[in-house]
């Protein structure tokens, strides 16, 4: 893949399709006209909330309350560079009293009120969460560990590498609360069927009840150190990508003020497990959100 890319630029796009991936998650297929797109799997774009008339008063209120401008929001690309259309997948954020300082601004609009034909301006493309040439050259196996919408850049990276590079074997550990929360379930199954020797998925579900049919590919509970060592016993030639939730600045600040200790986050737990298994911290590529 060519590491050189164009400078970040603004593009006006049109929503060509809206695909429901999970109850609170949609993929927006974006038509860019004749604009040449130069990006890497794992990159993200940004969208400014100021361009949406429905948010005008809400943006003004939050800016007055915070005393600063509302920044653009970042969304990882679902699409890969070989595909005709650009795509992002948006999971609706929720306001949780005592946890989130302000109600989410843009994701509810994108996930619930975006229709075909709608136009918007995006800015892209950038981000460090990529399978670059150096990492690709030094690895034979790739372990991906993600949770929730952390699958979005992960999916882009995996499908592109499977299609255009024959060297690597990919293993994905993907954690969600319930089965219905799994994003890209059918797409991941199709990739497994198409590349049975190179791609394997293990799902972990943390909140399914006892009536759910768990098996070797659908496990109960959180990602554990034991599971990681089971699916990736040798890290000598393995690249590791981790994408999922971490503690927010607000959560850390609130806990400090109350003198409380935060429970380990998904990102914190997984990185700790990997380090205890002997993976150097600088060998772990990570991207977090919260």
Residue ranges and their predicted role:
Residues 2-118, 177-178, 206-207:
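Ferredoxin-reductase
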Residues 141-157:
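A phosphate-binding catalytic loop at a beta-strand-loop-alpha-helix junction
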Residues 42, 150, 245:
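Short, conserved phosphate/pyrophosphate- and ester-handling motifs at nucleotide-, phospho-/glycolipid
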Residues 173-290:
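Reductase modules of NAD(P)H-dependent flavoproteins
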Residues 124-138:
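A short, basic/flexible loop-to-alpha-helix module at the beginning of a structural domain
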Residues 139, 163-170:
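Conserved S-adenosyl-L-methionine
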Residues 77, 153-165:
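Histidine-anchored nucleotide/phosphate-binding helix
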């Amino acid at each position: 893949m060519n590491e050189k890319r164009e400078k970040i630029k603004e593009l006006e796009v049109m929503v060509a399709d809206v695909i429901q991936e999970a109850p609170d998650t949609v993929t927006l297929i974006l038509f860019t006209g004749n604009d040449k797109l130069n990006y890497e799997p794992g990159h993200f774009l940004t969208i400014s909330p100021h361009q949406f008339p429905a948010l005008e008063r809400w943006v003004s209120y939050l800016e007055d309350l915070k005393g600063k401008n509302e920044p653009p929001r970042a969304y990882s690309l679902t699409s890969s560079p070989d595909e005709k259309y650009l795509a992002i997948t948006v999971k609706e954020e929720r306001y949780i009293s005592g946890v989130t300082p302000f109600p989410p601004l843009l994701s509810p609009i994108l996930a619930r009120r975006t229709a075909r034909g709608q136009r918007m301006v995006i800015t892209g493309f950038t981000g460090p969460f990529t399978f670059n040439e150096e990492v690709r050259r030094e690895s034979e196996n790739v372990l991906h560990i993600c949770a929730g919408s952390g699958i979005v850049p992960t999916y882009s990276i995996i499908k592109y590498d499977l299609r255009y590079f024959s060297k690597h074997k990919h293993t994905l550990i993907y954690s969600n609360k319930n089965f219905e929360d799994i994003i890209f379930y059918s797409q991941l199954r199709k990739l497994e069927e198409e590349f049975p020797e190179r791609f394997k998925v293990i799902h972990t579900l943390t909140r399914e009840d006892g009536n759910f049919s768990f098996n070797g590919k659908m496990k109960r509970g959180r990602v554990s150190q034991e599971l990681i060592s089971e699916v990736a016993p040798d890290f000598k030639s393995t690249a590791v990508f981790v994408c999922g939730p971490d503690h927010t600045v607000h959560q850390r600040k609130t806990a400090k003020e109350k003198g409380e200790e935060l429970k380990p986050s998904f990102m914190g737990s997984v990185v700790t497990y990997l380090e205890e298994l002997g993976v150097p911290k600088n060998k772990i590529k990570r991207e977090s959100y919260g």
